[in-house]
A protein has these predicted regions:
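Compositionally biased, intrinsically disordered or flexible polar/acidic segments
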Residues: 670-854
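Extended acidic/polar, glycine-enriched regions
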Residues: 112, 185-279, 647
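Accessory beta-strand-rich segments of carbohydrate-active enzymes
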Residues: 13-15, 24, 53-161, 165-167, ...
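Extended carbohydrate-recognition surfaces in non-catalytic/accessory domains of CAZymes
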Residues: 12-76, 129, 135, 141-144, ...
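A short tyrosine-centered beta-strand micro-motif
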Residues: 117, 250-254, 649-651, 754-766
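Extended substrate-binding grooves/exosites of carbohydrate-active enzymes
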Residues: 35-44, 126, 131, 137, ...
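Surface beta-strand/loop "capping" patches
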Residues: 155-191, 581-616, 671-678
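Accessory carbohydrate-binding/adhesion or oligomerization-edge regions at the termini
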Residues: 12-46, 118, 122, 128, ...
Length: 854
C-alpha cells in the first residue's frame, strides 16, 4: 500500500488524500486506484443484464506526525455510494447511509501519532429498502467517487459536526436595490478541557477585493462544548444585485482566533444579494423582476467514467450549460459536487437542488429517518451558495405505485398516505431549515398527485412531462398546462423535465415520435419552448437532460444509456444544443448550420432541407459559393430546401454580424442500375436512416419498392413495421435490429449485374428479454409469451436457398443480433430479390447490407 506523511501547522488545514488507495471486491485481490473511483464504470454497460451491487473494500495508510497530538482530526468523505463503514486502525469510527452527501468522522482518539495509520472503508451499493433511491432511471454506481479529506484543526474551531457543514450559515435580510443586510450564524466547538477566550473576525469584500464591512466579536467557550454565535452586519447601501445576467459576487471572510490574535480557523464563501419569489399567475421573479427560467437537468456521470468524474470535466459541464444560454439548472436527482454550485454562483445560474427520493418510498421508520437525515445534510452543506434558490426532496414519487399490480387497493391507499406524510415532514423540515428558499417537488404525468393533494405541499410544483414522446402529441402540452392552471389557479408550476431520446447517428426526413432522430428532438424542444413562452403562469422549463447518462436497464439505440440529452454522453453537442443558443443567447450574434449527418444520402431527389439556427432576424444563404436565397429566422430557425450535387457541397450563411459554413458530402440514390454503389445498406422496417460509423456506411430508410431503387414488394404480406425497445446482444448497432419488418416475404433491390456479398440482419422480437423494462411504452410491448418456436422460414436470394428452416429462437435464448451472409452472382439484369418463405409463423427482417465484390 502507498503511504503519505502529513505535518500540519497550528491552524486548521485540509489535505485531499485521493491518491494511492487500494481497492478489492473480496479483500483478497487488491489493485491500486485513485479517488474518484467506481467499480461499475464497465459492467453497467456490457451485454450482461444488471451490474454489480454489493461490497467494495478500500484501504490506505497515512502517516500522522507527533506534533499533531494537540489537534483534532477528521476524516471527510464528500460522497460514497451508497453506504460506508469506516475503520481507523481496526476501530469502527462510523457508518453513513446515503450516496450523494458528504460526511465526516472525528478520528483523533483512534490515531497513532508519529506512525502510520490504517484507513479502511467498506462500501455497499446493494439495494437497501431503507435507503433512497430505491428505484430510478439512472445507474447506482458503487464506490468512493468524490474527494476524501483529512482535516486537522486546533481544539477551538468552526464546527465540523453539524451534518458535515462548514459550521456557519449565511442569511440575508432587507435585500433590495437600495440596501441589503447579512447575518451569519456560526457554530464554534471547544475540544479543550478548560475554558477559552476567542474572537471572530468577519469581513465583507466586493468583487474587486475592497473591504466593504467588517465585524468582530469576542466570546468565551466553556470546556468541551459548542457555542452558537450570530453576527449581524449593518445594511450595505446600494448593493450590486446577483442575477444570471450580472452574477456579481461579494466575498465573506471568517477568521477564528485565540485571545492573542493567532488564527485558529478560517473560512470564506460567496455572497450574492438577490431575492426570488413565484407567482401563480405571473411566474418567477428575481430581484422583483420577471424572468422565465429556461435550462437543463444534469446527471453527474460521464462516458467511460461512470460517476467517478474528474472535477475539471464536471466544471466544464457548467460552462457548457451557461454557454447554451441557460439561466437555471436542476441538479438531478441528488446533490452534486459542491464545486459545481460555486461555479453556478460565479457564472450566474439559478439552482434547483434535491435529494434522491425517487419513484417510491418504503413504509418504515428507518426509511423516514434516513430521508430526513439526507435532507438535513443537503440543506446544511449547500446552504451558503447564493445560486441555490429551489430545494426539493421528491421526484415522481408515485411512479411505481401507478403501475404496481401486486399491491391491493388497501395497501396502495396506505402507501399513498405514508408517502404524503413523509412529504409533509420533509416540506416542513425544508421550510424550517432553509428559509428564504423555494421548496419544490417533481411529479410525473398522473392524477395521483392532485388526488392525494401532495402537489399542494411545495411552493413550486415541477411537472415531468413527455407529451409527444411516451404519449399523445407535442401540442397536448399546452392543453395540460392550461387545464392544471384552471383547476389549481393558486399553484405555481414549472416543467421540470421534458425531451425525447436522440441518437446522432439517426436522421429522418419525416420525423415522428420515438424515432430517436435529432430532427424529432428539435421539433419537440422547439414546440415545448413555444408553448411555455406563450404562458406567463408557467415559471419555466428544464430540459431532460443536459447530456446522455447511464441507465443500465435501458435498451435503446445506445444500450444502457438514457439518450434524452441535448449533448452526447461524451459532451459532444447534439444539434438542438445550438438551437437553444439561438433563442437564449442575445448578447452576441450567433448562427449555426445544423449538420445532422455530414454524409447525406438523397433518395430520388437532389435537394435537401438545410436547417439553420440564429439569433438574428435574417441572413443570406450561399450554396457552393453562389447566393441562393435571402432567409428569415422564426423562433431561431430557418429551414430551406437546397439543391445539392453529387460529392462535396459547401453551404454558407451570412448575417449582418456573423457567419457559419459547413460541407455536406452528398451521395445521390436516383437509379441503382445506372449509378451503382459499391456498398448499399438498408434499415428495414423504419423511416429512419442510420449511420454506422465503424463501417462508414449509412443504412437508408425502408420504403415500398419502385423501379431502379429498392423496397419491399407489393402483395408480399402485411409488411408491418415493429419496434423492439430492448438491448440487442452481439451488436453495437441496435438501431438496425430494433426495427423489424414483419410478415413481408419479398424484398427487391435493383442492383446491376455482378458478384455481391449480401448480409441480412435478423433478430427474434418475441424472445423474452433478460433486462427488466421499467419505463414501458404503449407500443413497445414485449411478446415474450408468444410461441416463438413457431417462427420458422427459409431464406432465398434470387430463388437460391441460403438458409433452410431458419429458427432464431432455437439458436438463441435472448434478443440476439444475427447476420446471415451469402455471396450471389447477379446476371441478366434481374437485380436482387430476397425471399423469406414462411414455414411456421411470420417472417422478420431488420436490415440489408450489399457489398460489390467485382
Amino acid at each position: 500500500m502507498s503511504c503519505v506523511a502529513f505535518s500540519f501547522s497550528a491552524f486548521a488545514q485540509t489535505k485531499t488524500i485521493n491518491s494511492g488507495w487500494q481497492y478489492s471486491e473480496n479483500k483478497t485481490n487488491w489493485e491500486t486506484i485513485n479517488i474518484p473511483h467506481t467499480w461499475n464504470d464497465k459492467d453497467a454497460f456490457d451485454d450482461a443484464p444488471g451490474y454489480r451491487r454489493g461490497l467494495g473494500y478500500y484501504q490506505k495508510q497515512i502517516f500522522v506526525a507527533s506534533d499533531e497530538k494537540e489537534n483534532i482530526h477528521y476524516l471527510k468523505f464528500n460522497a460514497v455510494n451508497q453506504e460506508a463503514t469506516v475503520f481507523v486502525n481496526g476501530h469502527n469510527v462510523g457508518n453513513h447511509k446515503g450516496g450523494y452527501t458528504a460526511f465526516n468522522f472525528e478520528i483523533t482518539k483512534y490515531l497513532n501519532f508519529n506512525d502510520f495509520n490504517h484507513i479502511e472503508v467498506i462500501v455497499d451499493n446493494s439495494h437497501n429498502e431503507n435507503i433512497p433511491p430505491l428505484d430510478a432511471d439512472f445507474t447506482f454506481y458503487g464506490g468512493i467517487y468524490r474527494d476524501v479529506e483529512l482535516i486537522s484543526v486546533p481544539k477551538q474551531h468552526l464546527s465540523l459536526t453539524d451534518f458535515a457543514s462548514d459550521g456557519y450559515y449565511v442569511n440575508y435580510y432587507n435585500v433590495s436595490e437600495e440596501q441589503a443586510g447579512v447575518e451569519v450564524k456560526l457554530l464554534v466547538d471547544n475540544f479543550d478541557s478548560f475554558k477559552s477566550q476567542n474572537h471572530l473576525y468577519l469581513k465583507i469584500l466586493d468583487a474587486e477585493g475592497q473591504l466593504i464591512l467588517e465585524e468582530h466579536k469576542g466570546f468565551k467557550l466553556n470546556a468541551a462544548t459548542s457555542k452558537d454565535i450570530t453576527i449581524t452586519f449593518p445594511e450595505i447601501e446600494n448593493p450590486k444585485l446577483w442575477s444570471p445576467n450580472n452574477p456579481y459576487l461579494y466575498k465573506l471572510e471568517i477568521s477564528l482566533t485565540d485571545k492573542k490574535g493567532n488564527i485558529l480557523d478560517s473560512k470564506s464563501s460567496n455572497l450574492g444579494f438577490r431575492w426570488a419569489t413565484v407567482d401563480a399567475e405571473k411566474g418567477f421573479f428575481l430581484n422583483g423582476k420577471p424572468i422565465k427560467l429556461v435550462g437543463v437537468n444534469r446527471h453527474q456521470d460521464y462516458e467511460s467514467y461512470g460517476n467517478a468524474v474528474p472535477l475539471s470535466l464536471q466544471k466544464k459541464d457548467i460552462e457548457l450549460i451557461k454557454e447554451m444560454g441557460s439561466n437555471v439548472i436542476r441538479f438531478a436527482h441528488y446533490p452534486h459536487a459542491r464545486e459545481l454550485y460555486k461555479k453556478c454562483d460565479e457564472l450566474g445560474i439559478l439552482v434547483w437542488t434535491e435529494i434522491p427520493i425517487v419513484n417510491k418510498v418504503t413504509n418504515t421508520e428507518a426509511f423516514v429517518n434516513v430521508s430526513k437525515q439526507m435532507q438535513k445534510e443537503h440543506i446544511k452543506q449547500y446552504y451558503n451558495f447564493p445560486s441555490v434558490v429551489m430545494i426539493g426532496y421528491m421526484n415522481e414519487i408515485f411512479l411505481r405505485l401507478a403501475f404496481d399490480k401486486k399491491e391491493s387497493d388497501e395497501e396502495k391507499e396506505h402507501r399513498k398516505q405514508f408517502t404524503y406524510n413523509l412529504a409533509k415532514q420533509l416540506e416542513d423540515l425544508t421550510r424550517r431549515e432553509a428559509p428564504n428558499h423555494i421548496t419544490v417537488m417533481a411529479l410525473h404525468f398522473n392524477e395521483l398527485y392532485n388526488e392525494t393533494k401532495i402537489a399542494d405541499l411545495p411552493m413550486l410544483v415541477g411537472w415531468n412531462l413527455y407529451f409527444g414522446w411516451y404519449h399523445d402529441t407535442i401540442e397536448d402540452l399546452g392543453v395540460f398546462l392550461d387545464d392544471q392552471h384552471q383547476r389549481y389557479p393558486k399553484r405555481s408550476l414549472l416543467i421540470s423535465e421534458y425531451g425525447p431520446g436522440a441518437d446522432v447517428r439517426i436522421s429522418a426526413t419525416e420525423p415522428s415520435r420515438y424515432d430517436y432522430s435529432q430532427d424529432y428532438q428539435l421539433l419537440l424542444h422547439s414546440g415545448y419552448y413555444s408553448q411555455v413562452m406563450e404562458r406567463d403562469f408557467v415559471t419555466g422549463m428544464t430540459a431532460w437532460n443536459f447530456a446522455d447518462f447511464g441507465s443500465e436497464f435501458r435498451g435503446e439505440t445506445i444500450p444502457h444509456v438514457n439518450q434524452k440529452g441535448i449533448m452526447q454522453y461524451n459532451r459532444a453537442p447534439k444539434e438542438v444544443y445550438y438551437w437553444y443558443q439561438s433563442v437564449l443567447k442575445t448578447k452576441e450574434p450567433f448562427v449555426h448550420i445544423a449538420n445532422y449527418q455530414n454524409e447525406l444520402n438523397l433518395l430520388e431527389k437532389n435537394t435537401h432541407e438545410v436547417v439553420i439556427f440564429s439569433n438574428q432576424n435574417e441572413g443570406k444563404l450561399y450554396v457552393n459559393d453562389v447566393l441562393y436565397k435571402d432567409i428569415n429566422f422564426e423562433l431561431g430557425i430557418a429551414k430551406i430546401e437546397v439543391p445539392l450535387k453529387q460529392g462535396v457541397n459547401t453551404v454558407k450563411v451570412e448575417t449582418a454580424n456573423t457567419t457559419d459554413e459547413t460541407d455536406f458530402n452528398v451521395e445521390l440514390f436516383q437509379n441503382l442500375k445506372t449509378n451503382p454503389k459499391s456498398v448499399l445498406a438498408i434499415n428495414v422496417g423504419t423511416h429512419i436512416s442510420f449511420r454506422d460509423d465503424i463501417l462508414g456506411v449509412t443504412f437508408l430508410k425502408d420504403r415500398p419498392y419502385s423501379d431502379n431503387l429498392y423496397g419491399y414488394l407489393p402483395n408480399s404480406g402485411k409488411c408491418t413495421k415493429k419496434l423492439i425497445p430492448f438491448n440487442i446482444s452481439n451488436t453495437i448497432n441496435e438501431a438496425v435490429y430494433q426495427t423489424v419488418l414483419v410478415d413481408c416475404n419479398a424484398y427487391k433491390v435493383d442492383i446491376p449485374n455482378g458478384k455481391y456479398k449480401v448480409t441480412l440482419y435478423f433478430v427474434e422480437p418475441q424472445l423474452k428479454n433478460k433486462t427488466k423494462v421499467l419505463f414501458n411504452l404503449k407500443e413497445a410491448n414485449d411478446d415474450s409469451k408468444a410461441d416463438v418456436m413457431h417462427r420458422i422460414f427459409d431464406i432465398k436470394l434470387n430463388a437460391k436457398t441460403t438458409s433452410s428452416q431458419f429458427n432464431m429462437a432455437k439458436m438463441y435464448d435472448d434478443k440476439y443480433g444475427i447476420m446471415q451472409t451469402s455471396e450471389v452472382n447477379i446476371a441478366k439484369n434481374e437485380g436482387l430479390t430476397i425471399q423469406l418463405n414462411p414455414i411456421k409463423g411470420e417472417t422478420v427482417l431488420s436490415g440489408i447490407l450489399i457489398e460489390k465484390l467485382d
